[in-house]
């Protein structure tokens, strides 16, 4: 039995509650739903779901996106989707537009993309729409252009969960949020939600580092900030995949890295749910992370593109896989997948994708 089969079997047996009270996605049901959909599509008229699907990755320097890529390839095969080789836009919004056009020229009849820039991606979406090629956006919602579905988690909840954890565990002093790219709706949502939530903790002072999802930028800025503010008590990393390693290296170099429980410990909450974050939680280097569902991003990105190619449409409301579809804007639907807070108390949960991918 391979890792994917073991993961699916374990997930089939687990129905857990998130700390927010939201029901965890029953991965077994979700998988069954994908299989059922695949069967339904197979019975559709000839040509209804035929054609190659293009896969555009925003970057591959982050362990999160590396994991997402592996899940994409697995589920594309499992769902019998004829996928073109994934293209890596390498963190460059302009390159992503070029890559999307390349996929169209290669004959893609549908595209799954992780947008880098919420506005800039609109040009590529318009090009796809001109050829009647449906697009599913994963992780980042576009602010312009047409998509069949947006698949992401509630990114405002990421910022709120990080704020609440730090607010409850730091109590007083300075906290830093290392922000993502504010050209991305994800960066804006997390930053704004963290900032707004922190107003409820008047004894905490928020310092900010705009790092645009770049680890080297985060490291340099954090080094300078800590030199001027050696009394920082907490840090929020908006993307553990790119910020975790440089943050820990900077704290270690400044002799500020102490394990959780030590009076000198700097509390850290991250986002992503990658295996490296879980190991850092177990060591006591960081305290928590919000697990972005890389597995479900891939699964449902492909689910919705196959549905779009078969002519299926959806409406706002609860889904059969534990999430909620909301209307972001007129004609733009978003399937908001749950993302649990992971701490030392539940870091070994085998239902978390970061504990199953190898």
Task: Name each model-derived stretch.
Residues 118-157, 165, 171-174, 274-280, ...:
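Flexible loop/hinge segments that line or gate small-molecule binding clefts
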Residues 101, 109, 113-129, 194, ...:
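Hydrophobic alpha-helical
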Residues 64-79, 158-162, 185-204, 221, ...:
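Short, solvent-exposed amphipathic alpha-helices that sit
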Residues 197-198, 300, 304-358:
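Hinge/cleft segment of the Venus flytrap/periplasmic-binding protein
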Residues 78-89, 177, 198-215:
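Short beta-strand elements in bilobed, periplasmic/extracellular small-molecule ligand-binding domains
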Residues 17-33:
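Bacterial N-terminal signal peptides that target proteins for export
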Residues 52-71, 75-79, 84-99, 108, ...:
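Extracytoplasmic "Venus flytrap"
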Residues 96, 151-175, 188-189, 217-219, ...:
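Hydrophobic alpha-helical segments within soluble ligand-binding/sensing domains
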